Amino acid sequence: MSETVQKQGRVVEIDSHAINFGPQHPAAHGVLRLVLELDGEVVERADPHIGLLHRGTEKLIEYKSYLQALPYFDRLDYVSPMCEEHAFALATEKLLGITAPERAQWIRTMFAEITRILNHLLNLTTYALDGGAMTPVLWGHEEREKLLEFHEAVSGARFHANYFRPGGVAKDLPAGLTDRIADWTEKFPAFIDDMAGLLSDNRIWKQRVVDIGRMTPEQALAWGFSGPCIRASGIPWDLRKSQPYDKYADVDFEVPVGRNGDCYDRYLVRVEEMRQSVRIVKQCLGKIRPGPIKVQDHKITPPPRAEMKRSMEALIHHFKLYTEGYHVPEGATYTAVESPKGEFGVYLVSDGSNRPYRCKIRPTGFAHLQAIDVMAHRHMLADAVVIIGSLDLVFGEVDR
């Protein structure tokens, strides 16, 4: 935008100026490069440049077996890895025509919700930091550490878990873990109340986020929003309710919905989602029963170590599984899960071989990021920071 000013008999042309926001900026949440066209401090245009974390994940998966492809999903949205694995595991199960055992489904549902809380803890606390509040991020990391210990207990890894598998989960829950999780579910709601008490009615926080980056329900649908971002705009769309998978049909929970579609509502929706996730985890703990944790077809899941020491067939199954992998019948499926950020989908095509013919990943943040021009228009430069924070972007999945 340029304007003409008449000054002392001269006509002076004043042009807007463009600046780079990121990719080195700490509030860019990774490697976002945002070219902002400013009129003074007012954002006239926001042009996101992506691809700085592109690793060719979709193409790499075409050269791996289905089992080898799974760990790539941990590295997409590396803040909520088990939810990404969940989508690929369900898609592969659909093509194979198998269903994970009851116990495995309850474990996966429980850890998907633990992962949701992990994600929201990081987002809400760093989002508050973007707005100038330093205390929540110090509190939040202490709580996240407890949840990462649960990740480590079942998978051996804090972040890149590689725990969900087509047909179930990699290992059973270690002894005593359910008691530790149950103890944590009793204490964690008090932390949510403390954090919400620090921010929800804080006058300074509300000045930063209320009526900033508003999206109407029509705009949210048009831009392909999902997850907390679309629910903050007043649309109660949640795949766990509308298209339940694993054990979500057997648990009771509410879908929090906002009214104004602004940064404040996106914050409130995530706070309430953490409360609902604790509620789901409690129900999972009460309903998990003893049983197998993976399908008993050893052409798909590895046989137990003890059986391999006794049976030649078990040894052959293990060797074939880890050298060649299993062959998936020809077909295609689109399978989506309600990840902490929104709808994370996998379009998986099999040509009957042991490798995916095509694996198209539908990232959540990609749709949200493209709307930033609309959301930041005519807001101040400082508001662009909280808008980015409210979208909960992770560039591992945006760039793939």
Curated annotation (Swiss-Prot):
One GO term describing the cellular component: plasma membrane
Subcellular location: Cell inner membrane
PROSITE patterns: COMPLEX1_49K
Catalysis: reaction(s): a quinone + NADH + 5 H(+)(in) = a quinol + NAD(+) + 4 H(+)(out)
InterPro entries linked: NADH_Q_OxRdtase_suD, NADH_UbQ_OxRdtase_49kDa_CS, NDH1_su_D/H, NiFe-Hase_large
Enzyme Commission numbers on file: 7.1.1.-
Topology of the protein relative to the lipid bilayer: Peripheral membrane protein
Enzyme class (EC, first level): translocase
An annotated Gene Ontology molecular function: NADH:ubiquinone reductase (non-electrogenic) activity
Subunit comment: NDH-1 is composed of 14 different subunits. Subunits NuoB, C, D, E, F, and G constitute the peripheral sector of the complex.
HAMAP family documented for this protein: NDH1_NuoD
Protein family (similarity comment): Belongs to the complex I 49 kDa subunit family.
Record function comment: NDH-1 shuttles electrons from NADH, via FMN and iron-sulfur (Fe-S) centers, to quinones in the respiratory chain. The immediate electron acceptor for the enzyme in this species is believed to be ubiquinone. Couples the redox reaction to proton translocation (for every two electrons transferred, four hydrogen ions are translocated across the cytoplasmic membrane), and thus conserves the redox energy in a proton gradient.
Protein known as: NADH-quinone oxidoreductase subunit D
Protein encoded by which gene: nuoD
